[in-house]
Design a protein with these regions (language model features):
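Periplasmic peptidoglycan-binding/tethering modules of Gram-negative envelope proteins
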Residues: 1-73, 130, 139-140
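Periplasmic OmpA-like peptidoglycan-binding domain that tethers envelope proteins to the cell wall
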Residues: 53, 78-140
Length: 140
């Protein structure tokens, strides 16, 4: 992992090289080469407010590891499809992803290393409350 931070790190001022690196990261993320298990952050009904503020500790650790090893992150927002309309759930899933992205940026993760996805309303998990989440995955 230490060599990954050198290969993919943003050590120079060459903007063309940075563009290539960002492109390579995007390709790796799209290829699905996730490191470890995803981390889920759960939200209250119809809000972008976490169900429990202690979840921020997970964000602290994700940011620490991502910075240490020069990793990229995919942040995927979702809402439960059993409430709201497709349009509202699409907006809510975006707000939830935006919230987590903003918190990662506050912790020193450059926006160039974050890919944001919004899934809208989903029904993937039981109980239904489990669909009110944002998932964060780490990638080389």
């Amino acid at each position: 992992l230490d060599s990954a931070s050198i290969v993919y790190g943003n050590n120079g001022d060459d903007s063309e090289k940075r563009g290539i690196i960002v492109s390579e990261r995007t390709e790796l993320i799209q290829a699905g080469n996730c490191i470890g298990s995803p981390v889920y952050f759960f939200f209250n009904l119809n809000t972008a407010h976490l169900t429990d503020a202690s979840q921020m500790l997970n964000l602290d650790e994700l940011a620490r590891v991502a910075k240490k090893y020069g990793l990229s992150l995919r942040v995927t927002g979702a809402a439960d499809s059993s409430t709201g309309t497709p349009v509202l759930n699409g907006s809510l899933s975006t707000l939830r992803a935006d919230h987590i992205v903003a918190e990662l940026e506050k912790r020193g993760i450059p926006i160039e290393r974050i890919v944001k996805v919004s899934r809208g309303g989903i029904a993937d998990h039981v109980p239904v409350e489990a669909n009110r989440h944002t998932k964060v995955e780490l990638f080389f």
